[in-house]
Amino acid sequence: MRFFGEVPEQYDYIEFCRDEFVAILPSNHMLTIHDTIPISKLKNETFILLGKDTKFDLVCQELFRSTGITPRIRLMGRCPENIIGFVGMGMGVSLLMRRHAEFFKTPQITIREITPTAESRICLIWKKNRPLSPAAATFLKFLQE
């Protein structure tokens, strides 16, 4: 499960990895010369973002609010690979999680770090004080070794 912030107290967990938002730009975009881009530099861009029914959208919108940006949104989608394709065609820029961006990267896009960013944690979680099934206990033991 992906968490932005802390895992709720009622759960135990094993953290597998962390992830962060990055900027996805067409490879010929003028900001690709920078290794890190302040979000404020994207204020005049047209965005292609993940849809409003995702946790990513809530966090992304908070990043915009925290930097005083009202994004111009051309398109919202559900699939990171489609968003990356549209960015690669020059239809706009995007903010996506680094792992999505790296997995679906094409020569037509460039990935850049942003400031500020938001970090997520990908974890296996289970309820505290609740016995695990034998299969779940075996799986958990396997992961912990």
Pin down the residues of each PLM region:
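Hydrophobic/proline-rich hinge and linker segments of small-molecule sensing/allosteric domains
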Residues: 10-52, 119-130, 140, 144
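Central regulatory/effector-binding core of bacterial HTH transcription factors
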Residues: 1-9, 70, 76-79
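Beta-alpha-beta core module
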Residues: 6-20, 34-35, 81-128
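A local structural motif
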Residues: 65-74, 108-109
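Short, flexible helix/strand-to-coil boundary loops that buttress conserved ligand/catalytic motifs
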Residues: 25, 35, 60, 105, ...
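Hydrophobic alpha-helical segments typical of transmembrane helices
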Residues: 38, 59-60, 82, 120, ...
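Conserved SAM-binding loop
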Residues: 49, 75, 93-94
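Secondary-structure junction motif
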Residues: 3, 45-67, 132-140
